[in-house]
């Protein structure tokens, strides 16, 4: 089991240890495909392999359409700042358990001993991104403990999460850029099967978002893990070389590194709602 403590990232304005990315949190591709199938309500991939083709609305209850994405919450409904709890499905309880084993705590201060019941996550939000979809820069708000863990699924669909200082990323151009074109404070390349964990100032003092895909995520100097992005681009080398050749033929010179997304990306955002309606469990 990968340990969170071995995968910290350094970012401006963020305390050491408050930002981490485990590249292969789900180490086995077949396991990731099975988890993705469970999340999507039993939708099958071709030949039992990774799910890489776009789908209509995922099957099963609870799915809603929001800003071009299909979303579903498990663990209960958040009304205001209070969770009306309901049982987590088995795939979510397994994920919460694995987060604890990896050292991810959801205490009131954004950490704490993962083994303590009070520090365990109680809510998971699934987002299904069709090709080209992003999410506006946002904060998750005070209803949750100040820590979020995001698991990325979809074998051919990496993404770049961009973080903006509070007030600089509240909308504008295309779904993941800062207001008025503000530059991100830092960005993180999210390969499939990776787990991003952020807490502290990364959670409370920054907005995070993913740009709408208008040809791919262009890698810039804000990226904290450029080597991982370059390795991914190299693995997808044929398309990259073709793009580069076309750029040179058109006299545009060296093309910037661009991360192409596949047709289906699913993220699982795991958090703990601080206030839970006592004595109420919706079945």
What kind of region is each of these model predictions?
Residues 1-243, 248-283:
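Non-heme Fe(II) oxygenase metal-center motifs and adjacent flexible, charged/small-residue loops
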